[in-house]
Amino acid sequence: NGAAVGVGATMQLPADIRIATSNSRYGFVFAKRGIVPDGCASWFLPKIIGIPRALELCYSGRVINSDEALKLGLVDYLVEEDQLLDKAFELSDLYLNSSSPVSVAMTRHMIWSLSAEDSPENAHIIESKLINSRGASEDAKEGVMSFLEKRDAKFSNKISSDLPDDFPWRKSIFKADK
């Protein structure tokens, strides 16, 4: 909402979903100031919009409007200013109330980690193991039953206690707890 230039542009990059208002502007102006991108922008930005587009925005320091940001894929949704919080709540409700929290957490780790692999082989191996363990979970049973009964699912598994033992990133999720 408003100008996101420099660190304002980079700090939103790690977000899974980015919502902008029609008055938003984005600028990666670091080279114009004699410095380089920060906030891991050199890692996130090319993953989000591609290397050539990331280079163009960083080389030029051009400030773009919200329409161009949406077109580039820098933001996922474009709304009017008075609809920003409504859209955020709508999406959070959609993601948090209709999907298994454990499956969402696992999917996030899998996509961020496995998309960096050189080939799909490791993704296939990990997915094959995890579909079996998650397929036997209470959440999977609830997901199927809610579909068959045409009702909303009520997932009971918790990230803190129900991540499968064979989930490769299990220890890194709970590292901060120790």
Q: Where do the protein language model's features map onto the residues?
A:
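Crotonase-fold acyl-CoA enzyme core
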Residues: 1-102, 137
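Proteins with a high burden of low-complexity, intrinsically disordered sequence enriched in S/T/G/P/A and R
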Residues: 2, 30, 129-131, 177-178
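Hydrophobic alpha-helical segments typical of transmembrane helices
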Residues: 41-44, 53, 106, 127-130, ...
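C-terminal long alpha-helix characteristic of the crotonase
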Residues: 19-24, 66, 75-126, 132-138, ...
